[in-house]
UniProtKB/Swiss-Prot annotation:
It comes from Triticum aestivum (Wheat). Belongs to the Ninja family. Its main location: nucleus. It is found in: Nucleus. InterPro entries: Ninja_fam, Ninja_motif, NLS_NINJA_AFP-like, TDBD. Residues 184-197, 221-234 have a biased composition (Low complexity). Keywords: Nucleus. GO terms for biological process: negative regulation of DNA-templated transcription; signal transduction. Residues 1-28, 68-142, 156-237 are annotated as: Disordered. This is Ninja-family protein 1. One of its GO terms (cellular component) is nucleus. Residues 99-108 have a biased composition (Basic and acidic residues). Residues 156-166 have a biased composition (Polar residues).
Length: 315
């Protein structure tokens, strides 16, 4: 009895232990694996055993294709939501075509306004300059008559019959006089317009004054008397030069002899006589001058040199 109880108790404990072990294994199977280790496919608790139909935890992933769970496609579609669309970021805000065109139109309008202001400023400056010059011309017009007006007045004074009609000529003379008067008035108008357009003439040289009020002396005019005096002075100078440095020429006989002109250079007492050759401009002694003319070595070279009292062409 005791042995039975012992065996039964012992066997019961064994059965109870086996029951407890079975219950613990079931509970261990029911507990999900929540370890921090990496798993293939990004899924936790994926057992291919008898508990494959139990709900499992799904790890989030950036790509939906990475998660592969055993089961039907409907369960996967219900378990994994569709990924949100990715938005591309940019540093500058995107602008539409209308804003771009509006900005370009504003820039073109600003450029046109600036250009218009520059043109208005330039025209105002030009008008001010033209107004000042016209007033200056009007002020100087009665002081300086034009050359055309002077010529017209001289012609009218020389031909009085052209401006006055002949007496007793009848209607033809009157028509001629009226037409001549109209032509003269038109010419006067044209002359006044030309006078306005021409710059004012320069003041006369005799009345030249400096800014300090000092009258500047002008050079004398070249008159006929001054020219004659100048010619006489040059003639006197040439005459004095001929007296100081007379013209000479060589007189050499022989086949190699030739005539060479020169002039006796001015010298003082005690200095050597020197002759300037006209053909080369060299300063030569009398012996060298005769040798230059082809005379060779002579004992008295001054006998072969002739003094010309008349002026030479070279002076």
């Amino acid at each position: 009895m005791a042995s039975r109880d012992f065996l039964g108790r012992f066997g019961g404990e064994k059965g109870a232990a086996s029951d407890k072990a079975g219950g613990g294994a079931g509970e261990a199977d029911e507990v999900a694996e929540l370890s921090l280790g990496l798993s293939l496919g990004g899924c936790f608790g994926a057992n291919s055993g008898r508990d494959a139909k139990k709900p499992r935890l799904v790890r989030s992933s950036s790509l939906a294709a990475m998660c592969s769970l055993p089961g039907t496609s409907d369960d996967l579609a219900a378990a994994t939501p569709p990924p949100a669309p990715l938005m591309r970021t940019s540093s500058l805000p995107t602008e539409t075509e209308e804003e771009r065109w509006r900005r370009r139109e504003m820039q073109s309008l600003k450029r046109l306004q600036a250009k218009r202001k520059r043109l208005e400023r330039r025209t105002s400056m030009n008008s001010g300059k033209s107004g000042g010059s016209s007033s200056r011309d009007d002020a100087q017009e009665p002081l300086y008559p034009s050359a055309f007006q002077l010529r017209r007045s001289v012609v009218d004074q020389g031909n009085p019959s052209s401006s006055m009609p002949e007496q007793g000529s009848g209607d033809g003379a009157e028509v001629k006089s009226t037409s001549s008067m109209e032509i003269s008035s038109d010419n006067n108008n044209n002359a006044s317009n030309q006078n306005k357009s021409l710059p004012p003439p320069a003041p006369s040289p005799a009345a030249g004054k400096l800014p300090n009020g000092i009258v500047k002396e002008q050079p004398p005019l070249r008159t006929l008397r001054s020219l004659t005096m100048r010619t006489t002075s040059t003639g006197d100078l040439r005459k004095s030069m001929m007296e100081d440095m007379p013209m000479v020429s060589s007189k050499v006989d022989g086949p190699n002899g030739k005539k060479i002109d020169g002039f006796l250079y001015k010298y003082r007492k005690g200095e050597e006589v020197r002759i300037v050759c006209v053909c080369h401009g060299n300063f030569l002694t009398p012996a060298e001058f005769v040798k230059h003319a082809g005379g060779g070595d002579v004992t008295n070279p001054l006998r072969h040199i002739v003094v010309n009292p008349s002026p030479s062409v070279f002076l």
